[in-house]
UniProtKB/Swiss-Prot annotation:
Gene of this entry: ureF
Protein name: Urease accessory protein UreF
Similarity comment: Belongs to the UreF family.
The keyword Cytoplasm is assigned to this record: yes
Ranges in a coiled coil: none
Length: 211
């Protein structure tokens, strides 16, 4: 498998790590009336990419480059994820990615990841073993941060798939810029609104998405 093919596979929404059941907070944003159409979805995605996307991608890039150990990165991710519900969602997806990695690269020792690493931590470890660069790993994390929420909003608001696809294409330069910044050093931004949305969603009865 070539590096480009591996990058595309890791960024594929069909990757069986459970990402399809997570909306990245957009379900709660829709329910709360904060995201109602393409314009407000665009604003939400930009905000999420610049904050949560940057932080997650920077942790992944640091793990990939070896500037953070898996254990240290796990602690750093906990510290940067105030909402317990968001930490749970991150570990659920990280567990799925670690499980897949053990099948795809069975010759590698994945013991350090443990059972349920945070998703950015697992992403960094997988990117390194897969032969990507830290920047490519960061881009994969930023891209899936954006597309996961975009696809969820499309379903929740019954948006035209073509319109949503065009919106995500338009955000490509932002994703590139954020990924480049993420590859430089771990970021420590936070967004209280996104934390509140994540926690409130976990307390809602019968949501469509897990987070």
């Amino acid at each position: 498998m070539t590096t480009l093919t591996t990058l595309l596979a890791l960024a594929d929404s069909r990757l069986p790590i459970g990402g399809h059941v997570h909306s990245g907070g957009v379900e709660e944003a829709v329910t709360s009336g904060l995201v109602t159409n393409l314009e407000t979805l665009h604003a939400y995605l930009v905000r999420r990419v610049r904050t949560q996307g940057l932080v997650a991608a920077s942790i992944a890039a640091a793990v990939h480059a070896g500037t953070l150990t898996v254990a240290a990165a796990d602690r750093e991710t906990d510290a940067r994820t105030p909402a317990p519900a968001a930490r749970t969602a991150s570990r659920a997806q990280g567990r799925g990615l670690a499980r897949l990695a053990r099948r795809v690269w069975p010759g590698h020792d994945w013991t350090a990841l443990g059972r349920a690493p945070h998703l950015p931590v697992a992403s960094g470890a997988v990117g390194a073993v897969a032969g990507l660069t830290p920047g490519q790993t960061a881009l994969s994390v930023v891209y899936t941060t954006m597309t996961g929420s975009a696809t969820a909003a499309q379903r929740l608001l019954a948006l035209d798939p073509g319109d949503v696809a065009a919106l995500t294409f338009g955000l490509a330069p932002l994703c590139d810029d954020v990924a480049a910044a993420a590859a430089e050093e771990p970021a420590d931004l936070s967004d209280p609104l996104l934390d509140v949305l994540a926690q409130r969603h976990s307390e809602r009865e019968r949501p469509l998405f897990a987070s």
